[in-house]
UniProtKB/Swiss-Prot annotation:
Subunit record text: Homodimer.
Pathway membership, UniProt: Amino-acid biosynthesis; L-serine biosynthesis; L-serine from 3-phospho-D-glycerate: step 2/3
A GO CC annotation given for this chain: cytoplasm
Entry protein name: Phosphoserine aminotransferase
UniProt lineage: Bacteria, Bacillati, Bacillota, Bacilli, Bacillales
Length: 360
């Protein structure tokens, strides 16, 4: 069977050259006579893999020396707890900006650790936009401020990163890390689950300023303390070694594409193909405020559930799969991460045009 175009929000499409290299090295990695999946994480071979992955990420994101790159487990969802356990250490209070389902879940976990202030929210607009933060961060005594740079479910993203004076800015970048350029120095902590733009599920990346490490309460569990990973080069216990290995190959592929600046231009072009059609369509609509449209996750719908279901079924027959929208939003959603080729997006648009002609 030929490969399909997979528009899944995560786990998501991986670059075909990456999969082919993994396939080639799967049984016998680098002449060792064993697979990465069988290899000791204490071996020199794996040490070089995790070191190279960290170096590549630093290079691609231009990460300053005062930041640590940590390879973690538990998904971004575990970070919802780790962050307050490690950073709510002075005022026992944090600020959260609500822009979607995931930021709301992050807030709910933080409330179990300390006091949470909702700085701004677009919930009244059904999370179809990004709220303004002007003047809301005056002299607040907060341990950190948390944002979600791209909202996977709702299809919105920050156009400008808010300036937070004297308070660490924490960002969930799970669905748009490495898809566009960010100034890492604006953040105290960046975290992301790997399974959208970095690699396979099982790995979480944290990029954290060194002066934010070491402040966890003494009752903080060892495995939830950033210091544990910092002191042990992310090798305190067995890491998700295969996921780290595949992520390294994805980062190599990304570098070959010209790095983040080149991939950002590709992503703008790909998303424009779909948005331009949606703006002209008489059948399909996008619920998102055009100012804050995501480059990665694009929700859209037709006037009826029946048409939505028909669209999804016929799309699947054409090899355009996993287009069903999240249950909280409905309709359809095309996730067009870094690895999605422009041809895949064009195939989707061509099909949407045909479907509209059939259902005028």
């Amino acid at each position: 069977m030929e490969r399909v175009y997979n528009f899944s929000a995560g786990p998501s499409i991986l670059p075909l050259p990456v999969l082919e290299k993994v396939q080639k090295e799967l049984v016998n990695y680098n002449g060792t006579g064993m697979s990465i999946m069988e290899m000791s994480h204490r071996s020199s071979y794996f040490q070089s893999i995790i070191d190279e992955a960290g170096s590549l990420l630093r290079e691609l994101m231009n990460i300053p020396d005062e930041y640590e790159v940590l390879f973690l487990q538990g998904g971004a969802s575990l970070q919802f707890s780790m962050i307050p356990l490690n950073l709510m250490n002075t005022y026992k209070k944090a600020g959260y900006v609500l822009t979607g389902s995931w930021s709301k879940k992050a807030l709910q976990e933080a409330e179990k650790v300390g006091e949470v202030q909702v700085i701004a929210s677009s919930e009244n607009e059904k999370f179809t936009t990004i709220p303004k933060l002007d003047g809301l961060l005056g002299n607040e005594k907060l341990d950190y401020v948390h944002i979600t740079t791209n909202n996977t479910i709702e299809g919105t993203k920050y156009v400008d990163i808010p300036h937070v004076d004297k308070v660490p800015l924490v960002a969930d970048m799970s669905s748009n890390i490495l898809s566009e350029r960010y100034d890492v120095s604006k953040f105290g902590l960046i975290y992301a689950g790997a399974q959208k733009n970095l690699g396979p599920a099982g790995l979480t990346i944290a990029i954290i300023k060194r002066d934010l490490i070491g402040g966890a309460d003494r009752y903080c569990p060892t495995m939830l303390n950033y210091e544990t990973y910092s002191k042990n080069n992310s090798l305190y216990n067995t890491p998700p070694s295969f996921s780290i290995y595949v992520t390294k190959i994805v980062l190599e592929w990304l570098k070959e594409q010209g790095g983040v600046s080149a991939i950002e231009e590709q992503n703008k072009m790909k998303s424009s193909l779909l948005y331009n059609f949606l703006d002209e369509s008489k059948l399909f609509t996008s619920p998102v405020d055009p100012t804050y449209r995501s480059l990665m996750n694009i929700p859209f719908t037709t006037p009826s559930e029946e048409l939505n279901n028909e669209f999804l079924q016929k799309a699947k027959e054409r090899g355009l799969v996993t287009l069903k929208g999240h249950r909280s939003v409905g309709g359809m959603r095309a996730s067009i991460y870094n690895a999605m080729p422009a041809h895949g997006v064009q195939q989707l648009v061509n099909y949407m045009k045909e479907f509209e002609l059939e259902n005028r």
